[in-house]
A protein has these predicted regions:
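An N-terminally biased module of ancient metal coordination in phosphate/nucleic-acid-related enzymes
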Residues: 1-84
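Non-cysteine beta-strand/loop elements that form the S-adenosyl-L-methionine
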Residues: 38-40, 96-106
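Short glycine/proline-enriched coil/turn segments at helix->beta-strand junctions
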Residues: 74, 93-95
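Catalytic cores of alpha/beta
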Residues: 86-93
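Acidic/polar active-site rim loop that often engages polyanionic ligands
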Residues: 107-111
Length: 111
């Protein structure tokens, strides 16, 4: 299938709940001819702590994406995104875009 011109902005790596390292995902997107790719790791949620970014991991992710944007410049346009759970505080600083999501509903203070 020809994926030239196709972009994906809802991609999770092993930094949250995906299986592959960010660079492996980027390399595959380049192989497929994708001109743009947005990684969108999960924002921190206490009920999803093993698969979401805490404050330090969030900073590390933004820094990593900055380095990868430079490394892959001219081969693919990269975007640093975050998938933000509706029930958690929003901090979009450092991100190119935010995906709003609802994974859990709060009922009487519990998920």
């Amino acid at each position: 299938m020809d994926r030239s011109g196709f972009s994906d902005f809802h991609v999770h790596s092993a930094l949250s709940d995906g299986a592959d390292a960010p660079e492996a995902i980027i390399e595959r997107a380049i192989e497929l001819g994708m001109p743009r790719l947005g990684l969108s790791e999960h924002s921190f949620a206490p009920y999803y702590a093993d698969h979401s970014l805490d404050a330090q991991a969030r900073k590390d992710y933004i820094a990593l994406m900055s380095r990868l944007k430079e490394k892959y410049r001219g081969r693919i346009r990269l975007f640093c995104g975050i998938e933000q759970e509706y029930s958690c505080p929003i901090n979009a600083e450092g991100f190119d875009y935010v995906i709003g999501s609802v994974h859990y509903f709060m009922l009487d203070g519990d998920c």
